[in-house]
Regions:
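Structured beta-strand-rich core segments of catalytic domains in phosphoester-bond hydrolases
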Residues: 1-9, 51-130, 226-228
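Acidic, histidine-bearing metal-coordination/catalytic regions of metal-dependent phosphoesterases
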Residues: 1-23
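Acidic/histidine-rich helix-loop elements
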Residues: 15, 21-39, 81, 108-112, ...
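Active-site beta-strand termini and strand-to-loop segments that position acidic
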Residues: 17-18, 92-95, 120-128, 215-216, ...
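Active-site beta-strand/loop signature of hydrolases that rely on acidic residues for catalysis
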Residues: 22-29, 42-65, 121, 132-136, ...
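Active site of divalent-metal-dependent phosphoester/diester hydrolases
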Residues: 38, 75-93, 110-114, 173-238
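Metal-dependent phosphoester/phosphodiester hydrolase catalytic core
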Residues: 129-132, 136-143
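Alpha-helical scaffold elements lining the catalytic groove of polysaccharide deacetylases
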Residues: 145-156
Length: 244
């Protein structure tokens, strides 16, 4: 394992702007996305829960083989690379990408000596208005002080973003202090927390849910956690948004 040297991206929908209603699927796939059972589960999910955006954490991308997202444009924020694979965040969409920005944590996780990443992408409506999509995986296996410092670092980046925003991912907020730090992060960016149906399907650590969706400037039509029968150690959250 070593520091990533590339952040793959492919844009093939650059003439397709956001629609007034759009949907997303957020999922920590636990590096399971190359298994046939994952592809079968994803196909079934997308048939029942069509999604314009896929926000994956712990995505495993082969360097020299097809990766299974041929119908989507995508951007990746890698936090780890090996001879054959790249790992990290992946945001895929059937809409155009206006920009992307990648932020790696300064600190490394103690057990694996890897950093975590944040991927910020922007997607335009036809009139030029923009939605910022933030895909996050909060750092783990560090002190609370380091966790909090990394959140502040990301907050500073996002404070420069105006307009509509969705922040989603695995935040690793499994303690009272981490929950409070994330709540302060949410409030500082004027974000609302999505109320998720079937919340008991959300991944929990020490009985605390760690996968979340936050948003502003949009109407949340619905959000639902979906039981995928342990394809990953997390379940996906599907959400539908409308432009105000």
């Amino acid at each position: 394992m070593f520091t990533p040297q590339q952040d793959p991206h492919l844009y093939q929908h650059q003439k397709k702007t956001l629609t007034q209603t759009f949907s997303m699927l957020c999922w920590n796939v636990h590096k399971e996305n190359m298994h046939p059972r994952f592809h079968l589960q994803l196909q079934q999910l997308l048939l029942k829960h069509p999604s314009d955006f896929l926000l994956f954490q712990e995505y495993k991308m082969p360097k020299h083989l097809p990766h299974g997202l041929k119908d989507f444009s995508y951007a990746m924020a890698a936090n780890m690379e090996t001879k054959r694979h790249i790992y990290g965040l992946l945001t895929a969409s059937s809409f155009s990408f206006e920009s992307r920005y990648i932020e790696l944590t300064h600190a490394k996780e103690l057990l694996f000596s890897t950093k975590k990443s944040m991927l910020l992408t922007s997607h335009p409506f036809a009139d030029g208005d923009t939605v910022h999509i933030v895909n996050m995986h909060g750092i783990n296996f560090v002190s609370f002080k380091v966790f909090s410092q990394e959140l502040v670092k990301i907050k500073t980046v996002l404070q420069s973003c105006e307009d509509k925003m969705i922040v989603s991912g695995d935040f690793n907020n499994w303690s009272k202090r981490r929950i409070q730090a994330l709540e302060e992060f949410r409030q500082s960016l004027s974000l609302e927390k999505a109320l998720v149906q079937e919340e008991h399907h959300i991944k929990r650590v020490f009985s605390k849910p760690i996968d979340h969706i936050f948003y502003r400037g949009l109407k949340l039509t619905r959000a639902e956690a979906i039981d995928t029968k342990k394809v990953s150690d997390h379940n996906p959250i599907h959400a539908v948004f409308e432009r105000l």
